[in-house]
Amino acid sequence: GEECDCGSPGNPCCDAATCKLRPGAQCAEGLCCEQCRFIKAGTVCRVARGDWNDDKCTGQSADCPRNGFYG
């Protein structure tokens, strides 16, 4: 299956012909993906509102997980 979105040939992380990540790339897009690499664990990817915790990258995924309610 697809590893990345082939729709954008300008993406340096994704091979538009095969829809696969380029060699050495961990990710192609996402709040926790920067320059084709996962952002380090603990980096805030979504600032919380109210009593919620800030959402932080896991270091293992390009997605920004919902970290949940504080308290």
Swiss-Prot record:
Report where it is expressed, by tissue. Answer: Expressed by the venom gland.
| Cellular localisation | Secreted
Note one Pfam family from the annotation.
Disintegrin
InterPro entries per UniProt: Disintegrin_CS (IPR018358), Disintegrin_dom (IPR001762), Disintegrin_dom_sf (IPR036436)
GO CC aspect terms: extracellular region; plasma membrane
Q: Does the keyword Zinc apply?
A: no
The record places the motif (Cell attachment site) at 49-51
Which Cys-Cys disulphide bridges does the record give? Answer: C4-C19, C6-C14, C13-C36, C27-C33, C32-C57, C45-C64
- Kindly indicate whether the keyword Secreted belongs to this entry: yes
Classify the source by domain of life: Eukaryota
SUPFAM superfamilies xref list: Blood coagulation inhibitor (disintegrin)
- Please classify the protein's predominant subcellular localization into one broad category: secreted
Q: Which GO terms label this protein's molecular function in UniProt?
A: toxin activity
Residues annotated as domain Disintegrin = 1-71
Provide this UniProt record's keywords sorted from A to Z.
Cell adhesion impairing toxin, Disulfide bond, Hemostasis impairing toxin, Platelet aggregation inhibiting toxin, Secreted, Toxin
User: Which purpose does this protein serve, as stated in its record?
Assistant: Strongly suppress platelet aggregation induced by ADP, collagen, thrombin, and epinephrine (IC(50)=17-33 nM). Also dose-dependently inhibits the adhesion of human melanoma cells to fibrinogen and fibronectin.
The miscellaneous annotation reads:
The disintegrin belongs to the medium disintegrin subfamily.
What family does the Swiss-Prot or TrEMBL record give for this protein?
A: Belongs to the venom metalloproteinase (M12B) family. P-II subfamily. P-IIa sub-subfamily.
Please identify the protein, giving its name as recorded. Disintegrin ussuristatin-1
* Protein species of origin: Gloydius ussuriensis
What is this organism's lineage? Eukaryota, Metazoa, Chordata, Craniata, Vertebrata
